[in-house]
């Protein structure tokens, strides 16, 4: 044996495999204000102790690998490793635990959601020792969140740009989502905006297809916006979807929108990716564009209760990456969303400081310091009868978006927009007068419909429409 080999052996390196919990389970650890904290829902394989499972998550999402390596001795694992510092049993679930993991801040690149997720969820979810794994929540310390720009503008700046206060904003997704020519698409936009909506929207999969190329759509929508603004005296917008196959093409589309003078563009942030989204958010702040975010593909990641990632984590990541609006479910419409859980991540989007509240699914106190807020968008299977509940649930700082609930009106798009605007104004007035929207909502809509034939027709069409299915993802009891 050579002297060099003898020296390496003498420093204590021992090849082989050892339990993760010996290094990465540290129940005595006191978390630091600068740590990123994660709450994982862990379902170990039979025979795997929860401490070993939690430690494996901490190891595989930070410095660990499956065997001891001699290069561990070339750095300070104690400084850089993730630590599973607490484990609790999930009441009512067999062999399921919440494992809390603390990550040192130096593990992450500044201002990069991409790097943060690559570390925390990039590899560990396929680990064989775990039957299932879900990231329930993250605590982002101010020392990390301050390295992000965040939303291009935020709630107050958007209201100032639009000169609209004291009520939710109204939107509409143009339908059919695919197949319209650019000119007919622009016509639908114009009818909705002149009827009283604040915004219309490209659907998430409207990019640049053979039936309607993006530049043609942008031009006809800009024409519709200017015409509706001239007729109504209100500032209008259409979410022009800039999502594209490359970042360069995406920015080119945003540049065109800016040159047309429109107020807002749109991005599909999960399918487009966080790097592209952050790049677009920076461009939007630099060039005065609002940024609407669609969460297409989110349910692939967040719908199952025991595996994946909860939407509250995706919402926090979006606030850091940048967006002025994001779709957040409706509670009352056709898409998944339990009320208390939805309100929990709505507050995480809008508020500066959110206290830990397990009854709403919030595992950690979150302090965003001065990062601007994001407006939640309620969209999916909603109509005029839902207006009181939506106004009561989401409050003023929200966008209520009616696609079929506008374009499905028996008299056309503009009357559909009128019906929604009248219903909203009636609900806001009733609320301001002290009436209980939750209890008196239907009566408020009926009273308003006496003075609006458009609303009366909408009420008749959708009086029997309900989406009453039990949510898949519920809060733990």
UniProtKB/Swiss-Prot annotation:
GO-annotated molecular function: magnesium ion binding; monooxygenase activity; ribulose-bisphosphate carboxylase activity
Cofactor(s) this protein cannot do without: Mg(2+)
Quaternary assembly: Heterohexadecamer of 8 large chains and 8 small chains; disulfide-linked. The disulfide link is formed within the large subunit homodimers.
Protein's recorded name: Ribulose bisphosphate carboxylase large chain
Family matches, as InterPro entries: RuBisCO, RuBisCo_large_chain_AS, RuBisCO_lsu_C, RuBisCO_lsu_C_sf, RuBisCO_lsu_fd_N, RuBisCO_lsu_N_sf, RuBisCO_lsuI
Sites of N-acetylproline modification: 3
Keyword Disulfide bond set for record: yes
Marked site: Transition state stabilizer: 334
Catalytic activity from the UniProt record: 2 (2R)-3-phosphoglycerate + 2 H(+) = D-ribulose 1,5-bisphosphate + CO2 + H2O; D-ribulose 1,5-bisphosphate + O2 = 2-phosphoglycolate + (2R)-3-phosphoglycerate + 2 H(+)
Organism this protein belongs to: Hyophorbe lagenicaulis
Role: RuBisCO catalyzes two reactions: the carboxylation of D-ribulose 1,5-bisphosphate, the primary event in carbon dioxide fixation, as well as the oxidative fragmentation of the pentose substrate in the photorespiration process. Both reactions occur simultaneously and in competition at the same active site.
UniProt binding sites for Mg(2+): 201, 203-204
Keywords, in A-Z order: Acetylation, Calvin cycle, Carbon dioxide fixation, Chloroplast, Disulfide bond, Lyase, Magnesium, Metal-binding, Methylation, Monooxygenase, Oxidoreductase, Photorespiration, Photosynthesis, Plastid
Family, as annotated: Belongs to the RuBisCO large chain family. Type I subfamily.
Residue positions where N6,N6,N6-trimethyllysine is found in the record: 14
Binding residues annotated for substrate, in chain numbering: 123, 173, 177, 295, 327, 379
Post-translational events: The disulfide bond which can form in the large chain dimeric partners within the hexadecamer appears to be associated with oxidative stress and protein turnover.
Proregion residues excised on maturation: 1-2
Cited HAMAP family: RuBisCO_L_type1 (MF_01338)
Cofactor binding comment, as recorded: Binds 1 Mg(2+) ion per subunit.
GO BP terms in the entry: photorespiration; reductive pentose-phosphate cycle
Other information: The basic functional RuBisCO is composed of a large chain homodimer in a 'head-to-tail' conformation. In form I RuBisCO this homodimer is arranged in a barrel-like tetramer with the small subunits forming a tetrameric 'cap' on each end of the 'barrel'.
Cellular component GO terms held in the UniProt record: chloroplast
EC number: 4.1.1.39
